[in-house]
Design a protein with these regions (language model features):
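N-terminal small-domain helix-loop-helix segment of the aminotransferase-like
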Residues: 1-58, 65
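A short helix->loop->beta-strand "cap" motif at the edges of active sites that frequently abuts
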Residues: 75, 96, 156-160
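Short beta->alpha connector loops at strand-helix junctions that form conserved
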Residues: 81, 100-105
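A short helix-loop-beta submotif of the ANL/AMP-binding
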Residues: 93-99
Length: 167
């Protein structure tokens, strides 16, 4: 919604790009990789190898790709419910089974039912947990102790954690 005409140079650049005929993400520039590597190096003094980085067109396609690549058909994926409904789609659409671990709601606050969660993680068919922090839709920001406990349980039961922390 612009109140003025687009600059002729911009119009011409759009025409040139449209003439190319390919509108997907065809080439990922080195700058893209370097931006991520530099961010982690500056903020966390951690060097990420380039081959750890994979370009995705969004969070939802990334989650679906991870579910597909890191699990096999008929394996189980744990989610803490209620949860962002797209997680269900990413699991079901890839032929995986969902295990719901309902959050507890007591005294106006949500918490993880660790007894139930461990039972679900201990299932030999469980290979992945999709974790959301802050939790969507309840808005809970999990504290360090909770995160460590979830991590410890996943390590104990050899379950990979996919952590969605976009918000």
């Amino acid at each position: 919604d612009m109140d003025f005409e687009t600059a002729p140079a911009v119009q011409e650049a759009i025409r040139e790009r449209a003439a190319h005929g390919v509108f997907g993400y065809t080439l990922i520039e080195d700058d893209w990789y370097e931006a991520y590597q530099n961010w982690w190096k500056i903020r966390h003094n951690f060097e990420i190898p380039r081959d750890w980085l994979i370009f995705c067109t969004g969070v939802v396609p990334a989650i679906s790709s991870i579910v597909r690549k890191m699990t096999t058909a008929a394996e189980k994926v744990v989610v803490l419910t209620p949860v962002y409904n797209i997680f269900f789609n990413s699991i079901y659409n890839n032929g995986r089974n969902i295990l719901e671990s309902p959050l507890k709601y007591e005294n106006g606050a949500y918490s993880i039912d660790f007894e139930d969660l461990e039972e679900k993680l201990a299932d030999p068919q469980t290979s992945l947990m999709i974790f959301c922090n802050p939790h969507n839709p309840v808005g809970k920001i999990w504290d360090k102790e909770t995160l460590e406990k979830v991590g410890d349980l996943c390590v104990k039961h050899h379950v990979l954690v996919l952590s969605d922390e976009i918000h």
